[in-house]
Amino acid sequence: MGAKSKSSSTRFFMFYLILISLSFLGLLLNFKPLFLLNPMIASPSIVEIRYSLPEPVKRTPIWLRLIRNYLPDEKKIRVGLLNIAENERESYEASGTSILENVHVSLDPLPNNLTWTSLFPVWIDEDHTWHIPSCPEVPLPKMEGSEADVDVVVVKVPCDGFSEKRGLRDVFRLQVNLAAANLVVESGRRNVDRTVYVVFIGSCGPMHEIFRCDERVKRVGDYWVYRPDLTRLKQKLLMPPGSCQIAPLGQGEAWIQDKNRNLTSEKTTLSSFTAQRVAYVTLLHSSEVYVCGAIALAQSIRQSGSTKDMILLHDDSITNISLIGLSLAGWKLRRVERIRSPFSKKRSYNEWNYSKLRVWQVTDYDKLVFIDADFIIVKNIDYLFSYPQLSAAGNNKVLFNSGVMVLEPSACLFEDLMLKSFKIGSYNGGDQGFLNEYFVWWHRLSKRLNTMKYFGDESRHDKARNLPENLEGIHYLGLKPWRCYRDYDCNWDLKTRRVYASESVHARWWKVYDKMPKKLKGYCGLNLKMEKNVEKWRKMAKLNGFPENHWKIRIKDPRKKNRLSQ
């Protein structure tokens, strides 16, 4: 009985197990996903599946966060990356819905023999007596395809050797800045009004000689954001890479380094960049010694045929009587506060020479040609307004002479000049030394524009000390003509001044004087103090036995009879 009951239980359990297995199998065979049963039903499982898919990684580097508010929302941008090392690319590349492409622009290595002094030689053969001056090549990238069409340029600027106490003359730094400028200009070639942003990365920022502070949008730490003016930038690229050559103006094609610049396809002359508001400017401060010189300068500009505005900056040392004469000569007068040279000695000749920095505050003009008040202009030089800042004649070594300069007034530049004037040293304690450390990249003007009345090297001059007839401007060093008798150059009378003496050059200043209106000549008269000095120098020349025997000359200068009372 017990065995029968156990067998019955076993059969029942097996039947129950089979029944359950068949039911489970039926359910499994008839199961369908919900979204297949009814695709119109909004199933949470679909949303969950979509959000679980991996998204592309978005990269928003610092530079993009700084400029994205300036970029158009609807446009996809192409980014040009310059001087970014391969192992740093991931840190600067951007991605996302607004990024079309990251383009890496490579730089060719600089030649080993390319130095700053080879770009800025002491002297060039302007007259082509022995050879035609040429410039060494600064390799720039060849822009092709998408490389020549970017909306943003991101560039790491080299700052090795940077110091707040001096200018940075570095060829690699120049190459990087010129390459950035070239990339911007090429990108805007099809649309001159196009906006291209440049983000410079580096503590020293870009070269202000190429990228102006007026074009700076913002700065955050080592990031400098610029929106450059493409027309101005293009003009910079049309200039030689240094003072190794003078750029021709208004004569056929402008200077172009055609090996690596696509700009050669355009016959663009620099004269097309002439600014609308231009003027000549000079400065008088601390005394009235140069009042006559400034009047003669103004008259020489007018005698050359120029009708451009003439601005004279002056401090309180210039009397009302003198201001009347200066105004009659053609100067528009503006009063300024003089600026002391931080590194000059008290009561030295250059103690207040930094007052020249005030010319950058004349911001109602686009471009100025500054001329020292001891100059005369011999030929029309209005063409200078076609040159960019900073253009000047060479002085020595890699330096320019600040006696004549083409500059572009700017409030932010003046502020920067003032800020750095207390940090950057000056080799001569004056404005010229400081400006040469601030503007290390400059453009050479012809020596004919700023010919100095200096004859230190007798082997380079004839015995008569004549200057060439094709001069454009003469810089009167030494004792000034109006402080001598017109009969001869009184620089001959002093041993230390004889290097500045020349009868013919002295006479050229008096030709300008002779053409002045009579009412202006009185401002160039002799006073008692001046005459005593001249007579003292004549006696010294006699004691020294100088062979020219100028002390024997009978003075006929009419100013001697009509001596000024003061």
Curated annotation (Swiss-Prot):
The record marks 356 as: Important for catalytic activity. One of its GO terms (cellular component) is Golgi membrane. Pfam families: Glyco_transf_8. SUPFAM superfamilies: Nucleotide-diphospho-sugar transferases. Its cofactor is Mn(2+). Coiled coil: none annotated. Its EC number is 2.4.1.-. It is found in: Golgi apparatus membrane. The chain crosses the membrane at residues 17-37. Substrate binds at residues 372-374, 401-403, 428-432, 475-480. Its main location: Golgi. GO terms for molecular function: glycosyltransferase activity; metal ion binding. One of its GO terms (biological process) is cell wall organization. It is a single-pass type II membrane protein. Mn(2+) binds at residues 372, 374, 475. Keywords: Cell wall biogenesis/degradation, Glycosyltransferase, Golgi apparatus, Manganese, Membrane, Metal-binding, Signal-anchor, Transferase, Transmembrane, Transmembrane helix. May be involved in the substitutions of the xylan backbone in stem glucuronoxylan. Belongs to the glycosyltransferase 8 family. Glycogenin subfamily. This is Putative UDP-glucuronate:xylan alpha-glucuronosyltransferase 5. It comes from Arabidopsis thaliana (Mouse-ear cress). The gene is GUX5.
